[in-house]
């Protein structure tokens, strides 16, 4: 398992600095919400990557990542038995992918992550509706943040965050 830091208050020790709401969504492949918005406490100085890893672990989800929770963290894949069962790219999104000659790829039944379905896919995250173009280990949550972790098939263009300037919609 990858290493990450868990910040935990002890008797009379540190109290949570606040809480955030985190959801995990895969509408781009027709799976909707994988994990509904869940309130998670965080501690002073804790990076979002540690908060997300704690949520994944407590929710029974597996993960693969690059880097670690304190630096260079990238969420590569989220896993659970049959996580991609019933996945289907919506027809209107498929039309956009075909129009740009997006290179399609296969996927694993138990994992959803980078290079699944397309060679431009991966997990992106948003804080309070804004796409964050920095790794989760570079973001320190604020009390009340609403965080959406979303699966994109084309560098964010399909989830309202086209990293190359293209935004097709919001699946």
Residue ranges of model-derived segments:
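Ubiquitin-like/PB1-type beta-grasp interaction modules and other compact soluble beta-rich domains
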Residues: 1-171
């Amino acid at each position: 398992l990858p290493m990450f830091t868990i910040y935990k208050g002890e008797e009379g020790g540190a109290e949570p600095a606040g809480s955030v709401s985190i959801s995990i969504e895969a509408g781009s492949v027709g799976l909707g919400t994988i994990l509904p918005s869940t309130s998670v406490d965080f501690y002073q100085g804790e990076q979002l990557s540690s908060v997300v890893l704690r949520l994944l672990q407590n929710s029974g989800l597996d993960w693969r990542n690059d880097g670690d929770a304190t630096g260079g963290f990238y969420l590569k894949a989220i896993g659970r038995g049959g996580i991609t069962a019933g996945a289907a790219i919506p027809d209107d999104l498929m039309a956009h992918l075909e129009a740009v000659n997006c290179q399609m790829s296969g996927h694993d039944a138990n994992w959803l992550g980078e290079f699944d379905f397309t060679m431009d896919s991966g997990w992106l995250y948003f804080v309070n509706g804004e796409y964050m173009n920095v790794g989760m280990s570079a973001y320190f949550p604020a009390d009340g943040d609403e965080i959406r972790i979303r699966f994109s098939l084309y560098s964010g263009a399909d989830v309202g965050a086209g990293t190359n300037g293209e935004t097709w919609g919001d699946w």
